[in-house]
């Protein structure tokens, strides 16, 4: 059973139509309903619940009561909700289990309401928005077969106790429920998301519509969910991002390597690490041996480091790989467009440091590197929220260092503190993007790892020739490339909601300039202009469709083309061009050389790739119907 619990000002519903052949019989009165000051329990009954319905009912009632007591709710509303799971129980079983949950809560003295089972319903809900307002629970009957899950993930889901704070640039550590979030709305949303740990995607985020409309990325029905296909424009954007991040990391001082995508389950060091890393794996059989698909570049880089001869003079030693792909078998209900995938591209750098002071110095440098990388893709600190995670002991011993990081970002950050260390790292930060559905996704991240050097036998020789274990920093300065695309598109979706013009960064725009002849008579001149732009390494195309000028301009606007160049008799005779600049809406006349200079200045320092589609619009296929 999956339960999503939302503490609400109210919920109201209205039955619209039957969703199954034999829905629960209801009266006219039951076709509508409302309850105020309520804990709403959205429930999916799963196939595995059929093995022991009574136990599932008992545990569900217990979990709901526990949350109701925490949020001080006397009213509870049971809402059948099939969208939390892809493995649903039979309708007859689900209906009976939900009825018993309803009765069990009533017997415990709660005022209980319920929505009817088996119908399409419209509903309105007003979530209270405090840190405990959104929580999720999973109930599995005893003896039910569970998927193989690493010990670290089990601990994270069952044993981990977190203490949440907000840390200000002034060094003030404030309990999260006592912090005044006025002026920090996104931080409030991020804190709620992190504390509730609800990762279920209830509806489609706006970036999905954009990635489909612009023919960038699409779902691939012929593959496992969470594996995507990229059309030419999307592949260009992804490729440029991959090149950009790789160049930044190599410029920082990393050595690029390449390692396998699968590893032996029985390798002693890998087996131990698997149980310390909170992720689900894909499993591959080769003969009678079992392998797992990598979920990061750690394994390959650690095995290279184990075999290398390393001196203290080589430290900090930085190694990097862009993994295309890494794999994590995320839960089906958590998959969401480009935000959460099962196959993804991860820029992954590991740094060996001789001691904690050197590790902290690298940590701070990589914090700044991550800010710089995100700035290049159009994301500033206003666009993301920071989480820093550590143990209570680390905080006491390194308080000034943590506060220094917060001063660098220049705004309050979320702190997750543990009484004891659950994972292989002692310190971690992430830059998290909060999207239009108030879901958060980690982009940049760095961790200081204190376990894996010894686990993998990675050593260096110190000044006295003695072997020592280094500390290891795990760094992704951008996060998964797909997540960067998600954040860019979600940011544009937000601008659209505010009535502003969306636009990709110029260096990432698949087409940077569109040349539009006012009629077929000026097509040759348009092609001449396009040739000059292409010769200057600017991505350009020509709209040669037999349509009115206004329609062509509207199409270019709809495609977010940064520069629209219109050419006709006047431009041909004068040797000038008429330009519409999307960034500020300005329309002006200029010489072609000036436009080239303007664009080249704006994209300086960023990678370039040629146009991903044919020059003429009339020669292009349509990838989506």
From Swiss-Prot:
Gene3D superfamilies given in the database record: Anticodon-binding domain, Bira Bifunctional Protein, Domain 2, D-tyrosyl-tRNA(Tyr) deacylase
Recorded catalytic activity of this chain's protein: tRNA(Thr) + L-threonine + ATP = L-threonyl-tRNA(Thr) + AMP + diphosphate + H(+)
Cofactor: Zn(2+)
Location(s), subcellular: Cytoplasm
GO biological process: threonyl-tRNA aminoacylation
Cited function: Catalyzes the attachment of threonine to tRNA(Thr) in a two-step reaction: L-threonine is first activated by ATP to form Thr-AMP and then transferred to the acceptor end of tRNA(Thr). Also edits incorrectly charged L-seryl-tRNA(Thr).
Entry-linked InterPro entries: aa-tRNA-synt_IIb, aa-tRNA-synth_II, aa-tRNA-synth_II/BPL/LPL, Anticodon-bd, Anticodon-bd_dom_sf, DTD-like_sf, Thr-tRNA-ligase_IIa, Threonyl-tRNA_syn_edit_dom_arc
Region annotation Catalytic: where it falls in the sequence: 206-505
Binding residue positions for Zn(2+): 298, 350, 474
Domain of life: Archaea
Protein name according to UniProt: Threonine--tRNA ligase
Comment block on domains: The N-terminal domain is an archaea-specific tRNA-editing domain that hydrolyzes incorrectly charged L-seryl-tRNA(Thr). Catalysis of tRNA editing is performed by the charged tRNA itself.
Quaternary structure and partners: Homodimer.
EC number: 6.1.1.3
């Amino acid at each position: 059973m999956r339960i999503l619990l939302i503490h609400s000002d109210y919920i109201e519903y209205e039955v619209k139509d039957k969703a199954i052949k034999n829905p629960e019989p209801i009266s006219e009165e039951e076709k509508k309903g409302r309850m105020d000051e309520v804990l709403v329990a959205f429930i999916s009954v799963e196939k595995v619940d059929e093995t022991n319905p009574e136990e599932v009912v008992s545990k569900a009632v217990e979990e709901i009561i526990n949350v109701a007591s925490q949020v001080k709710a006397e009213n509870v509303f049971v809402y059948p909700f099939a969208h939390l799971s892809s493995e649903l129980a039979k309708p007859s079983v689900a209906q009976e289990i939900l009825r018993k949950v309803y009765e069990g809560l009533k017997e415990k003295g709660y005022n209980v309401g319920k929505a009817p089972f088996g119908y399409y319903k419209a509903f309105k809900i007003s979530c209270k928005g405090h840190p405990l307002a959104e929580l999720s629970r999973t109930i599995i009957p005893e003896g039910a077969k569970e998927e193989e899950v690493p010990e670290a993930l089990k601990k994270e889901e069952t044993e981990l106790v977190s203490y949440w704070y907000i840390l200000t640039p002034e060094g003030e550590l404030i309990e999260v429920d006592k912090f005044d979030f006025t002026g920090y709305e996104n931080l409030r949303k991020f804190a709620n998301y992190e504390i509730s740990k609800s990762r279920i995607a209830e509806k489609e985020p706006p970036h999905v519509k954009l990635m489909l409309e612009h023919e960038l990325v699409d779902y691939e029905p012929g593959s496992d969910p969470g594996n995507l296909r990229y059309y030419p424009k999307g592949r260009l954007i992804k490729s440029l991002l991959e090149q950009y991040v790789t160049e930044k990391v190599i410029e920082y001082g990393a050595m690029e390597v390449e390692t396998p995508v699968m590893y032996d389950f029985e390798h002693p060091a890998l087996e131990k690490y698997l149980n310390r890393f909170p992720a689900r794996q894909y499993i591959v059989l080769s003969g009678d041996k079992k392998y797992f698909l990598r979920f990061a570049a750690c394994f390959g880089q650690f095995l290279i480091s184990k075999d290398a001869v390393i001196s203290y003079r080589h430290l900090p030693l930085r190694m990097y790989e862009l993994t295309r792909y890494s794999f994590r078998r995320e839960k089906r209900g958590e998959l969401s467009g480009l935000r959460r995938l099962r196959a993804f591209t991860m820029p992954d750098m590991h740094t060996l440091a001789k001691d904690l002071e050197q590790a902290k110095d690298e940590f701070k440098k990589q914090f700044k590197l991550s800010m710089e990388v995100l700035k290049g893709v159009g994301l500033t600190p206003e666009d993301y929220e920071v989480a820093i995670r550590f143990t209570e002991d680390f905080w006491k011993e390194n308080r000034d260092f943590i506060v220094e990081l917060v001063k660098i970002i220049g705004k309050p950050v979320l702190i997750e503190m543990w009484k004891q260390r659950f994972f292989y790292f002692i310190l971690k930060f992430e830059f998290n993007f909060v999207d239009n559905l108030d879901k958060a996704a980690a982009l940049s991240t760095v961790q200081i790892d204190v376990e894996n050097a010894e686990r993998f036998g990675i050593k260096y020789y110190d000044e006295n020739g003695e072997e020592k274990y280094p500390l290891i920093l795990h760094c992704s300065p951008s996060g998964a490339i797909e997540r960067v695309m998600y954040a860019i598109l979600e940011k544009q979706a937000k601008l659209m909601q505010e009535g502003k013009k969306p636009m990709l960064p110029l260096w990432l725009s698949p087409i940077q300039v569109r040349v539009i002849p006012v009629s077929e008579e000026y097509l040759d001149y348009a092609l001449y202009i396009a040739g000059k732009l292409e010769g200057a390494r600017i991505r350009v195309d020509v709209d040669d469709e037999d349509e009115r000028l206004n329609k062509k301009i509207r199409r270019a606007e709809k495609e977010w083309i940064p520069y629209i160049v219109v050419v006709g008799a006047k431009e041909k005779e004068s040797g000038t061009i008429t330009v519409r600049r999307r960034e500020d809406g300005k329309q002006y006349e200029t010489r072609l050389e000036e436009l080239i200079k303007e664009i080249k200045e704006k994209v300086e320092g960023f990678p370039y790739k040629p146009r991903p589609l044919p020059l003429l619009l009339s020669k292009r296929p349509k990838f989506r119907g």
